[in-house]
Amino acid sequence: MSDLPDTDFTQRFIFDERDVRGEWVSLDDSYAAVLARHEYPQPVQVLLGELMAATALLVGAMKFDGLLILQARSAGPIPLLMVECSSEREIRGMARYEADQIPAGATLSQLMPDGHLTLTIDPVKGQRYQGTVDLDGANLSECFTNYFVQSQQLNTRFWLNAQGGKARGLLLQQLPRDRQPDDEEREDSWQHVVALAKTLKPEEWTEGNETLLHRLYHEDAVRLFDIQPLRFNCSCSRERSGNALVSLGEHDAKALVDECGGTVEIDCQFCNERYFFDASDVAQLFAGGGTDVASETRH
């Protein structure tokens, strides 16, 4: 099989003779789409790309119908990183940061001190799940590894990389006992696949997925599953922005229009699209007319 072209996808794989599964993610266009909408400093670009890769890996590894949201928060120079990805594999991301407090080469602990990571699964049906842990690691790869070892009680490792406008990720997870019933054999097997993954060099991350996996595990029987494409898509809309105004109540919404000089601007923090509502738009919203009569929408 030849390598897949540069595109956006996740791909699961399994070791036929080991109790280990894996997942690979490649994000080119969707990561570029996020970066094109904001002038993020390099350290912010890297962390946001890594968080996008982690989110896509989790969507690929979990079975649910709905939305997965990852938020990293802190009181530091980067107070928020946020990525959303749907079960249809539509992804978007954003960051908030203090531009004058982000030196080149800053570490995660410097950029997000005392931070925490929140994972939310918002299903189409059923109850919402949310879990929060400290950002306990030298980098996001370590943070996610620690999160899942604690929550799932299974050996799990993440490797995340973002460079040159491309984001990549690798997930390895030990499966429940099946092919290898012996404890020592299972542990040796796990350490084997992890040790090989640790040999990945920075310049190798942007190579084709099959080339890379073959280089790492050519002595193992590795079975690749079909790729699952991803794409950037922002779920914002004029209707949602109008609903946000309606939630304020008619009196406060009209007062806000007056305070803003006759036109309220609502910005999407993900894609930078701007929605404008004047007094007649707000009156229509509360008259039950919806948002059909539009003031401007701008990028």
UniProtKB/Swiss-Prot annotation:
An example Gene Ontology CC term for this record: cytoplasm
Subcellular location: Cytoplasm
Tagged with keyword Hydrolase: no
Organism domain of life: Bacteria
Disulfide bonds: 234-236, 268-271
Modifications the protein undergoes after translation, according to the UniProt entry: Under oxidizing conditions two disulfide bonds are formed involving the reactive cysteines. Under reducing conditions zinc is bound to the reactive cysteines and the protein is inactive.
CDD domains: Hsp33
UniProt GO molecular function: protein folding chaperone; unfolded protein binding
Entries under InterPro entries matching the protein: Heat_shock_Hsp33, Heat_shock_Hsp33_C, Heat_shock_Hsp33_N, Hsp33_helix_hairpin_bin_dom_sf
GO terms (BP aspect): protein refolding
Keywords noted in UniProt: Chaperone, Cytoplasm, Disulfide bond, Redox-active center, Zinc
Function: Redox regulated molecular chaperone. Protects both thermally unfolding and oxidatively damaged proteins from irreversible aggregation. Plays an important role in the bacterial defense system toward oxidative stress.
NCBIfam families: PRK00114.1 (NF001033)
PANTHER family assigned: 33 KDA CHAPERONIN
Protein family per UniProt: Belongs to the HSP33 family.
Protein's name according to its UniProt entry: 33 kDa chaperonin
Organism: Pseudomonas putida (strain ATCC 47054 / DSM 6125 / CFBP 8728 / NCIMB 11950 / KT2440)
